[in-house]
C-alpha cells in the first residue's frame, strides 16, 4: 500500500519526510549534540556518520519499499523532530516499531505523545497493523513518560539491543495492540 500522509491535531502535525528536511535535521542534531548523544545509535565499528542528507535519502528509500514510514514532526508549522515507523511487517506478524526524537527547544510541550498517537492510529486504522512496539533505554525518563502517558504496556528488556554512546545498551520494550485502543489512541490519550 503506498503511504499518503498528513495528520494534524491542534498545533502538532505529521507529514512525510522530504529530502529538503535534511538541513533542518542537521541543524537541530548538531546544535543539540549533548541532548541527543545519550540516546542516538552509534556505529560499533567506527565514527558516527553525520551525513544527514544520506540518512534522509535512506529513509525515503525505505518508504519506497514500504518497510518504513519516515515522518516529520511539526509544531505550529515548524519542523521540530522526526518519528519513524520502521520494520513494517504485514501478514501474520502485522507489526511495526516506532522511534522518535524531538528538539529540546520544544520538549515537554506534549508534542511527542500526540505525534506517537497520530502515527499509531494511522498504522492501526489505515495500514491495518495489529501491534506497535517502542524500545526505550531505561535511563530515558522523558521517553518513558511518553509511553506511560499513552498506555503502552511494558513487555520486558532486550539486553544489549542497540549500540548507543559507544556501548551496547539494554532497552525496555513497550507495546500496544489495536484491540487495546478500539476507538483510537489519540482519543484515549485526550480523554485520560
Where are these regions (language model features)?
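A short helix-loop-beta-strand connector motif used in the catalytic cores of GNAT acetyltransferases and
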Residues: 44-45, 57-72
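Conserved GNAT-fold acetyl-CoA-binding loop/helix
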Residues: 37-57
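Short, charged low-complexity intrinsically disordered segments located at boundaries
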Residues: 51-62, 86-90, 151
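Acyl-donor (CoA/ACP) binding surface of acyl/acetyltransferases
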Residues: 1-24, 28-35, 70-192
Amino acid at each position: 500500500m503506498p503511504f499518503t500522509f498528513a495528520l494534524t491535531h491542534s498545533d502538532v502535525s505529521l507529514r512525510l519526510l522530504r529530502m529538503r528536511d535534511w538541513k533542518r535535521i542537521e541543524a537541530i542534531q548538531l546544535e543539540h549534540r549533548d541532548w541527543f548523544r545519550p540516546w542516538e545509535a552509534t556505529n560499533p565499528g567506527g565514527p558516527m556518520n553525520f551525513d544527514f542528507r544520506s540518512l534522509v535519502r535512506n529513509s525515503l528509500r525505505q518508504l519506497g519499499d514500504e518497510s518504513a514510514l519516515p515522518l516529520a514532526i511539526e509544531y505550529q508549522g515548524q519542523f521540530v523532530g522526526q518519528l519513524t515507523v520502521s520494520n513494517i511487517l504485514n501478514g501474520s506478524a502485522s507489526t511495526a516499531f516506532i522511534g522518535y526524537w524531538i528538539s529540546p527547544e520544544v520538549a515537554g510541550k506534549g508534542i511527542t505523545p500526540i505525534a506517537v498517537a497520530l502515527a499509531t492510529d494511522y498504522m492501526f486504522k489505515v495500514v491495518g497493523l495489529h501491534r506497535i512496539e517502542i524500545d526505550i533505554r531505561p535511563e530515558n525518563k522523558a521517553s518513558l513518560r511518553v509511553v506511560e502517558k499513552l498506555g503502552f504496556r511494558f513487555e520486558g528488556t532486550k539486553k544489549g539491543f542497540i549500540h548507543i554512546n559507544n556501548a551496547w545498551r539494554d532497552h525496555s520494550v513497550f507495546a500496544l495492540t489495536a484491540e487495546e485502543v478500539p476507538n483510537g489512541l489519540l482519543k484515549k490519550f485526550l480523554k485520560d
